[in-house]
Amino acid sequence: MANVTDPRDIILSPVISEKSYGLIEDNVYTFIVAPDSNKTQIKIAIEKIFKVKVDSVNTANRPGKRKRTRTGFGQRKATKRAIVTLAAGSKPIDLFGAPA
């Protein structure tokens, strides 16, 4: 980890889906991350951005889907997702920016 990068270059966006929204109750959050990032970089970035304690990080590489267009076929972008579990005593992450 010789490269010192901005944590916001690693964490691209939260995943908002029915499954990820249901996992929030268990202190598990899902993010789309940079494809070249590793679990240690993701953990440090989450702790810096949201000021929480991370218990574990699981990652999944999702291939892009082939989609039809008017002129033929196209390819959706491949993504890397990080499933982040927060420590037991950690405060929840406010993903939607609601006033406290």
Curated annotation (Swiss-Prot):
GO terms for molecular function: rRNA binding; structural constituent of ribosome. The keyword Ribonucleoprotein applies. GO terms for cellular component: ribonucleoprotein complex; ribosome. InterPro entries: Nucleotide-bd_a/b_plait_sf, Ribosomal_uL23-like, Ribosomal_uL23/eL15/eS24_sf, Ribosomal_uL23_CS. Keywords: Ribonucleoprotein, Ribosomal protein, RNA-binding, rRNA-binding. PANTHER family: 60S RIBOSOMAL PROTEIN L23A. Part of the 50S ribosomal subunit. Contacts protein L29, and trigger factor when it is bound to the ribosome. Belongs to the universal ribosomal protein uL23 family. NCBIfam families: PRK05738.2-4, PRK05738.2-5. HAMAP family: Ribosomal_uL23_B. This is Large ribosomal subunit protein uL23. The lineage of its organism: Bacteria, Bacillati, Actinomycetota, Actinomycetes, Mycobacteriales. The gene is rplW.
